[in-house]
Amino acid sequence: MCGIIGYIGPRRASPILVEGLKRLEYRGYDSAGIAVLNEGRIEIRKGAGKIDELVGKLKFQEIPGNIGIGHTRWATHGVPNDINAHPHTDCTGKIVVVHNGIVENFHELKEELLKKGHVFRSDTDTELIAHLIEENLRIIKNFEDAFRMALLRLKGSYALVVLFADDPERLYIARKDSPLIIGIGNGEMFVASDIPAFLAYTNKAVFLDDGEYGIVSRYEFIVKDIVTGFPKIKDVVTISWTLEMAEKGGFDHFMLKEIYEQPRAIKDAIYGNIEAIKEVAEVVSNYDKIIMIGMGTSYHAALVGKYLFQRFTKTPVIVEEASEFRYEYEDIIDKDTLVVAITQSGETADTVAGIKLAKNKGAKVLGIVNVVGSLATRIADITLYTHAGPEIGVAATKTYTTQLMVLTLLAMELGKKIGTDVSEIENILPRLPEIIDSALGLNEKIKGIAKNILPKHDLFYIGRGINVPTALEGALKIKEIAYVHAEGLSAGELKHGPLALIEEGVPVISIAPSGKTFEKMLSNIEEAKARGGYIISLGDDIRLSEISDEWIRLPKLPEEITPIVYIVPLQLLAYHLAVLRGNNPDRPRNLAKSVTVE
């Protein structure tokens, strides 16, 4: 992985490829390159490093030609260097490939091709795809057939685009377990791993499904089944968000912009789901075996969902990381199971695999997804959209709070069916965007706290009940973008081990809203303070000011709503700490926005 762009049309391809790659930078990468076909010759320029550096050094944008492909790479096979950067070619230099994913039978196929005389230049699994097509072309003279036969040999995951020097009018594309999208322009076509790469030119898109390949020319495309070769009918999706929504809009970083977009995003999540929530509640109200799955931040949303569903519907809920679910629950799920799969991108490999497993076992699958048209939305039985809009920063912010909002709305609707009183929360929902806006008003105070804890190497986040996931998410944000060790845990666990790590000056961030466990939280805070902990408390009770070094005062709210509001100051804290440490919060090291390999 990580980013793919392809273009065919009347314009010079290279500037469009460079622009597309820059719009995919948020996905994370260690190297980049482009290949452009012009007058029967493919020119490749690539290297390790950032796109701006490579453009300056290698002059990507100067390559002539109207058809080309580009890639940003995140190393999986082979170290990040100039040779391993994509694109890759066969022995003849006529077949050029960019690829996201992992070829699991790489070593077996490479050994076979080496015996047949192929010479490999890199350590990547991608290069063998070009050689495999080349080998097939020796026997099968039709390039499409040679391409499809190569796909049938590959095991693992891939999204790939192939450029063939002898066919200057077409791009060849394929997908299995890694996203790939066709952008339909006016006399031009785009191919990309994510929508922002081509959104400046068109908002019309076709999403490839697993097991499909395609042939793309200037004026048309055809998508076929890899196994049968039969054509498939594909729907054209109109992307509802704009390129401006995917720009910084005057903020220093996408992450800060997206934190500040949360009042709007929450409003859209509420009012964009009024009818959908009722319809979904009708479908899922009779399930009493519920499993929620997700990865990373989406897993934390699932943990909050568990508390919400259990409180409102009185139904026990299992929450599992999607990467574990697919291996441990195969014999547990059946037609009486509701699986709630939460994924921002709709392409998270482990979550998509979990959905497929659940479907194969006859379970009903509800997807909670941000990206319209993504794979999860196409394979789930029903989908609720979070309506967060594009999120470019790698660390999830507004997509998390909108996931929580959707889960809250659904749990309330289901609760009403059994007579649960949700009127207090219903009454406060119209004010929720305003409440989040007031939390954003604490930005300068939180920036000051970030300066105070800047020298610290360990942070501890504690919460109870529905805010244990808030502690986990707050700690994750610190790890993701500030690169500081942080641990989130139930406050009740402190005395069972972690308290041994609390010493003079160690920051302890306490999520402590009023509620049934507040008195217990006060006791836990006192325990940490007695060991010298530097106490930062979030809550509404004045007593927190007396036992805390820093008190982030938030309004008194129904406990079920607090995870949506209380995470906002923690997002700001992580952001400011990252910036103070000299990090780019939009592009944290070693991380990708959408994890499309397992």
From Swiss-Prot:
Its subcellular locations are: Cytoplasm
- Highest rank taxon of the organism: Archaea
EC code(s) of this entry: 2.6.1.16
> Which catalytic residues are annotated?
2 (nucleophile), 593 (for fru-6p isomerization activity)
Keyword field: Aminotransferase, Cytoplasm, Glutamine amidotransferase, Repeat, Transferase
Question: What residue stretches are annotated with the SIS domain?
Answer: 280-420, 449-588
List the InterPro entries.
GATase_2_dom, GFAT, GFAT_N, GlmS/AgaS_SIS, GlmS/FrlB_SIS, Ntn_hydrolases_N, SIS_dom, SIS_dom_sf
Q: What is its main location?
A: cytoplasm
Give the GO biological process terms: carbohydrate metabolic process; fructose 6-phosphate metabolic process; protein N-linked glycosylation; UDP-N-acetylglucosamine metabolic process
Q: What GO cellular-component annotations does this UniProt entry give?
A: cytoplasm
Listed SUPFAM superfamilies: N-terminal nucleophile aminohydrolases (Ntn hydrolases), SIS domain
Q: Which Pfam families match?
A: GATase_6, SIS
Q: Which reaction does it catalyse?
A: D-fructose 6-phosphate + L-glutamine = D-glucosamine 6-phosphate + L-glutamate
Quote the function comment for this protein.
Catalyzes the first step in hexosamine metabolism, converting fructose-6P into glucosamine-6P using glutamine as a nitrogen source.
Return the PANTHER family for the record.
GLUCOSAMINE--FRUCTOSE-6-PHOSPHATE AMINOTRANSFERASE, ISOMERIZING, GLUTAMINE--FRUCTOSE-6-PHOSPHATE TRANSAMINASE (ISOMERIZING)
Query: Can you state the subunit structure given in the record?
Result: Homodimer.
Q: What is this protein called?
A: Glutamine--fructose-6-phosphate aminotransferase [isomerizing]
**From which organism does this entry originate?**
Pyrococcus furiosus (strain ATCC 43587 / DSM 3638 / JCM 8422 / Vc1)
